[in-house]
Amino acid sequence: MPRFGAHMSISGGVSKSFARGESVGLDSMQIFAKNERQWTAKPISPEEATAFRTEQQRTGIHPVVVHDSYLINLAAPADELREKSIAAFADELERCAQLDIPYLVTHPGAHTGIGEEAGLARVADAICRLLAEGVGGNTMILLETTAGQGTALGYRFEHLARLFELIPYHERLGICVDTCHIFAAGYDIRDPEGYQTTFAELDRLVGLTRVKCFHLNDSQKDLGSRVDRHAHIGQGCIGVEAFRMLVNDPRFADLPMIIETPKGEDMAEDRMNLALLRSLVQGAE
């Protein structure tokens, strides 16, 4: 069975995320390693890192996945923004290494007008620069599929394939597939034929063994809208059958499948979405 998870708050410190995750019954979890809307943050103290490991051992929640800051744009043509982005991304990698977190999820960035190929080249150059220096230890960077809003890169599987061509550090590079994003980008996974076609295409271009994580989100917007709006599982334009196929796909049997669906402070919606996903697993009681 996949390891079902959700994005949890780190309010009060990164270690506090585990108790929240435990309260909604998570197997795996996604967090921010710092405030996602600020460029810099105070370092994680050794005490906080120890508390994080202790809480992870206590709850058994694994793997933990970090999503990087929304401010980071490794494709940015403006040198000042790009250098700030690279420095911030390096900090994210080092925070992951400090907490023994295996995966850092990032959107490939937005080219803001310089063109897709030039944007992808800048992303690759930035990542190569950091990985050549060994930044982040063994933490793997997961390139996330995007909906393709504005000039965002990563909405075509060809973009991801190009980044794998340009970045030789494949042992530290993987993919995170977001169901809402690929659907908004035009990949129809609602029926068996479309589902198989989509993942055959991803396998041909990138390789399914490089998929290390899923973001399971339904979509408020229709197929090919290029608009990123998440919905509760089965309550959007994708519908429940795509998720039934995903959670029973033996190729993805042990992967973290993390919801990023709308929720309030009591996280009741997380419990609802996770219960639905678990009920779709064949043989689940």
From Swiss-Prot:
Q: Which GO terms describe its biological process?
A: base-excision repair
Q: Which SUPFAM superfamilies match?
A: Xylose isomerase-like
Q: Which InterPro entries match?
A: AP_endonuc_2 (IPR001719), AP_endonuc_F2_Zn_BS (IPR018246), Xyl_isomerase-like_sf (IPR036237), Xyl_isomerase-like_TIM-brl (IPR013022)
Superkingdom is Bacteria
Q: Which Pfam families match?
A: AP_endonuc_2 (PF01261)
Q: Which residues bind Zn(2+) 1?
A: 67, 107, 144
Any idea which positions bind Zn(2+) 3?
A: 181, 228, 230
Q: What is its EC number?
A: 3.1.21.2
One function term, GO molecular function aspect: deoxyribonuclease IV (phage-T4-induced) activity
| List of residues binding Zn(2+) 2 | 144, 178, 215, 260
Keywords, comma-separated and alphabetical: DNA damage, DNA repair, Endonuclease, Hydrolase, Metal-binding, Nuclease, Zinc
Q: Catalytic activity, per the record? A: Endonucleolytic cleavage to 5'-phosphooligonucleotide end-products
SMART domains the UniProt entry points to: AP2Ec
Q: Does the keyword Zinc apply?
A: yes
**Which cofactors does this gene product need?**
Zn(2+)
Q: How is the cofactor bound?
A: Binds 3 Zn(2+) ions.
Gene3D superfamilies reported for this sequence: Divalent-metal-dependent TIM barrel enzymes
What does the UniProt function comment say about this protein?
A: Endonuclease IV plays a role in DNA repair. It cleaves phosphodiester bonds at apurinic or apyrimidinic (AP) sites, generating a 3'-hydroxyl group and a 5'-terminal sugar phosphate.
Q: Which family does it belong to?
A: Belongs to the AP endonuclease 2 family.
Quote the PANTHER family the UniProt record gives. APURINIC-APYRIMIDINIC ENDONUCLEASE, ENDONUCLEASE IV ENDODEOXYRIBONUCLEASE IV
Q: What is this protein called?
A: Probable endonuclease 4
Coding gene?
nfo
